[in-house]
Amino acid sequence: DLEALSKGLKEAGAGRLCLYGPPGTGKTEFCHWLAKKLERPLIMKKASDLLNCYVGGTEHNIAAAFEEAKRENAVLLFDEIDSFLQDRRTANHSWEVTQVNEFLTQMESYEGYLVATTNLLDLMDNACLRRFDLKAKLEYMTDDQAEEMYRRLAQKWKFSVGNEVNNLRKIRNLSP
């Protein structure tokens, strides 16, 4: 129940979520919705915002992202976090380890709302995964969910539902 989750997070005043699942299932969109429910701005960071070719640059950018979110009292979203937070045991370079260590350090001391999204949960560092309060898998809609969404949209947009609703069951990997 997403409403209950947002209410619980709001009451707690902080939380660390990891949303995972196939592409197009609404992970990033959920973060926008959650920020609105929490009445906070959303700060979204992608690997391109954080990765830096200079020694210590990525670590600096990670720390700056957390500081910005703290200053703005925002929900901090790391989108597609697997692109820079991979398992340290498979690291080929020392900087891969230090950027994960920096993220873990920042994550431990952060007292706000943190959300990470990934399509590749199995590639992420285990120490990082343990630090999330909740890991939630978002899947494609079931046939019943797709039909329910279609019916709700029909009601909202005032059109009648006919036999075309049965065609939804033929479409795979629908997302909201």
PLM regions and their residue ranges:
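The conserved phosphate-sensing helix
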Residues: 171-176
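Walker A/P-loop NTP-binding motif of AAA+ ATPase domains
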Residues: 1-169
